[in-house]
Regions:
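Active-site-adjacent "subsite" loops/lids of carbohydrate-active enzymes
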Residues: 355, 366-436, 520-536, 540
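Active-site neighborhood of glycoside hydrolase catalytic domains
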Residues: 413-504, 517-520
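Aromatic- and acidic-residue-enriched carbohydrate-binding clefts of CAZyme catalytic domains
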Residues: 327-349, 379-416, 449-474, 480
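Acidic-aromatic substrate-binding/catalytic surfaces of carbohydrate-active enzymes
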Residues: 4-94, 103
Length: 766
């Protein structure tokens, strides 16, 4: 503790000060490289931790500032590290038995600063419900008037929020809060708040087990930014049970933007258990046909509507095509799950349709949901499903509703640790694979939905918090995958969204982020409230930046038609009046389809198109979209070494015009009178960069507009893994056979891209 009553942690990049007077609150956080102070001076500093505790009379709040005794001890770690140990005790009744110990440390001057909740002792008559730790308040703007300030959130593939203090902290429409759950919609544990021209702050938990936690960016008492992590102990609320988090939290300053922050996270993440099978190029357990697919068709309905689209696209493109088939099942979509069998057209008709698709060279994957059971279904009572349901703190099943056309149906998430649910899904997968000779099963929701806090004491797992949800589903998936492989040794299991915890269990992940604007109306994630027209957010490929060479992603929601399908098993009264009428929105939104498809390719995602039905085939108004789809699929097919197996690199600077892409927002449950639109400003040319582990680098430029574009490409190849004395050659890609030696490692090149075209260059060292 220095003369000013401050305990200091100082690395080469970061200086933090903790106030003795304010019970260990972080009162200064400085990027040492630039001298930027991230925290504003406040009247009352934010407590380093807050807790909700349980007593006989109910729940009460407690924080570090309530302690009447606080002490800090500074010790050395090894030769060059430092650890601060902070202890809070002597709380007023009824918390007189509470004692809390945390540490803040670094191992050497070049390392990150790690926070640990070492021990939370509640005393004999108190239980710990949850603990918010660490908490950093007083966060201010980085750039002047927030110009250039960004917040990266690992929501699905990734979300970039512009001017986050204005967009979130000062925004009453979102209750001054951005909140997410991991595992769940938050697919990783790394956040970054940065201004590329000034400094950045990396905020993450490094938890290899997958414990349930919530990340919150909100407002402190004085209207500044605040970042906190809510941690849920095993056996929540049990009196006398001490709590220690099994994972550290990392807060450190860095230089750059979200790409540089992902490199920090990748250094930890790719050493975790979910990457233990190695990079994609090293893995022998993945489905080969899935690895080599370059075009997906997502269709819904009976065979005569579903099959012609993928068959026609297979003929047109010649690439490996796969069908993701929805609404093949007995039950109406999103209700009466998991009563999928028999197929709604009958087993024989369905089997013949699969056989025909195979004969035409198309792989077939069918949809099921791997997480929920409809409490209105007959099987709920017959199979005593309530015993396997995840229960809330009142020992009632969590309740959800999805189908707006059948709102009386209530859905319950199931607990993956229960044998009933494991058997239900694994037996269903085996039956589908054995009876219908499928190529795989897409298991919805498992990788996207919240890891519920299950309070059922009969399930055998810790009550409430912990990592049992992830481990339960990993066991379930592996069992189901083993069963599928008995019927088809090259079968794949896929799931919705992308999440690190299931990388080594699922073969791949369906991600729709390249069509995020289109699907926004179907998800209650508040981005419409964040000023959709104001360009306050945009999707970014954070997950693929970290894991592209470890996990395969596929998908988009892009469609050439403006009318979503309507399940024939839903009530006729809810059918939109335009259903069954052919409609295209290409005249009003001429660039949306190509923009979403270009994003998909640029992010290294296997391309997908949705809702390709017989009435669309051969129509002149779709010729341009079909031609671009064909070009994208063919390019992906020849570039799989980069676009499926390669490591993502930060794209170089490309100077090109910016265009306004007019987009409509409509998902499957969007009524005709609820359709909305927005404008997304984007460079006319989307750029991505990839490397193989042999060291070659490929730069891909995609012009999604209808007009030719001249783009100026500038690269310093020393920033892409090449050594200063390397002799570098460049060639067109796919390889033309002509290699040109570069006179310098700094490349400046004007690239002429025709409308809706792809140009790529490959760089190699001699």
């Amino acid at each position: 503790m220095n003369s000013e009553g401050l305990a200091v942690i100082e690395t080469n990049s970061t200086r933090m000060e903790f106030s003795d007077v304010q019970h260990g609150s972080i009162v200064s956080l400085v990027d040492k490289r630039t001298g930027h102070e991230f925290l504003r001076t406040v009247k009352t500093a934010t407590a380093l931790w807050e807790a909700t505790l349980v007593m006989t009379e109910g729940k009460k709040e407690l924080s570090a500032s309530d302690a009447r005794r606080f002490r800090v001890e500074t010790t050395k770690i090894g030769k060059r590290g430092t650890r601060l140990t902070m202890t809070w005790s002597d709380f007023a009744k009824p918390f007189q038995g509470v004692s809390v110990v945390t540490t803040v440390e670094y191992e050497c001057p070049d390392s990150q600063v790690k926070f640990r909740l070492l021990r939370f002792e509640p005393g004999t008559e108190v239980g710990v419900w949850h603990v918010d730790f660490p908490i950093v308040g007083g966060i201010g703007e980085i750039g002047k008037n927030e110009e250039g300030d960004e917040l990266e959130i690992p929501l699905l593939q990734g979300l970039l929020v512009h001017r986050p203090l204005t967009t979130i902290v000062k925004n009453e429409k979102v209750n001054h809060t951005s909140y997410g759950t991991y595992p769940g919609l938050l697919t990783m544990q790394c956040f970054s708040y940065f201004n590329e021209n000034v400094a950045g702050l990396y905020l993450a938990s490094h938890d290899g087990l997958g414990c349930r936690k919530d990340f919150v960016f909100d407002s402190d008492r004085e209207g500044n930014g605040r970042f906190r992590v809510r941690n849920y102990p095993e056996n929540m609320g049990f009196k006398g049970r001490n709590y220690s988090s099994s994972y550290p939290f990392v807060i450190t300053a860095f230089q750059g933007g979200w790409a540089e922050a992902t490199e920090i996270y990748r250094g930890w993440a790719t050493r975790q258990a979910w990457c233990r099978k190695g990079r994609l190029s090293q893995r022998s357990d993945l489905s080969n046909w899935f690895r080599n697919t370059s075009l997906w068709v997502w269709n819904r309905g009976n065979a005569d509507r579903v099959s012609p689209g993928p068959i026609e696209l297979k003929k047109k493109t010649g690439v490996n095509v796969a069908l993701d088939w929805y609404w093949w099942h007995h039950n109406p979509y999103d209700v009466f799950v998991p009563e999928y069998l028999p197929p709604r057209e009958g087993a024989l008709t369905f089997a013949k349709a699969v056989e025909k698709l195979h004969a035409m060279g198309t792989k077939v994957v069918v949809y099921i949901n791997g997480r929920i059971w409809d409490m209105n279904s007959g099987s709920w009572d017959e199979q005593r499903a309530s015993k396997a349901a995840a229960l809330d703190e009142n020992l009632k099943p969590y309740e959800e509703k999805y189908n707006i056309f059948m709102p009386e149906n209530v859905i319950a998430p199931m607990c993956p640790t229960t044998q009933l649910w494991r058997d239900k899904i694994s037996h269903l997968v085996s039956a589908l694979m054995e009876d219908f000779h499928l190529d795989g099963v897409y298991i919805d929701q498992v990788a996207i939905a919240t890891a519920e806090l299950c309070h059922n004491p009969e399930h055998g797992h810790p009550v409430g918090g912990g990592h049992y949800w992830v481990h339960g589903y990993n066991d379930l998936i592996r069992t189901a995958r083993d069963g599928a492989r008995k019927a088809n040794p090259d079968a794949c299991l896929l799931s919705e969204s992308c999440i690190e915890q299931f990388i080594d269990s699922f073969d791949g992940f369906l991600t729709l982020d390249s069509s995020w604007e289109r699907t926004g109306a179907n998800l209650d994630l508040s981005w419409d409230k964040m000023g959709l027209q104001g360009q306050t957010w945009e999707p970014i490929p954070v997950f693929n930046a970290v894991y592209h060479d470890y996990a395969i992603t596929f998908g988009s929601y892009t469609s050439m038609t403006g009318v979503p399908p309507y399940d024939d098993l839903w009530p006729e009264s809810g059918r939109p009046r335009e259903f069954g009428k052919f409609a295209t929105y290409n005249d009003k939104y001429p660039d949306q389809f190509a923009f979403e498809l270009a994003r998909t390719l640029s992010w290294g995602i296997q391309p997908m198109v949705t809702n390709v039905y017989p009435e669309m085939l051969g129509r002149e108004e779709f010729d341009a979209d079909m031609k671009f789809l064909e070009e994208v699929a063919k390019f992906h097919s020849v570039a799989r070494e980069y676009l499926t197996l390669g490591k993502w690199l930060k794209p170089p600077e490309v100077d090109c015009p910016c265009v306004a892409v007019k987009m409509y927002i409509r998902s499957i449950y969007t009524a005709p009178d609820r359709i909305s639109e927005m404008v997304r400003n984007s460079p006319a040319v989307l750029t991505s960069t990839w490397t193989t582990h042999e060291g070659s680098v490929c730069v891909v430029l995609v012009n999604f507009t209808r007009d030719p574009v001249n783009a100026k490409l500038a690269m310093d190849l020393n920033e892409y893994g090449f050594e200063p004395d390397d002799r570098i050659t460049v060639s067109d890609y796919p390889r033309s056979g002509v290699q040109t030696a570069l006179p310098s490692h700094k490349l400046e090149k004007t690239v002429n891209l025709p409308g809706r075209s792809i140009v790529a260059y490959e760089f190699s060292a001699k």
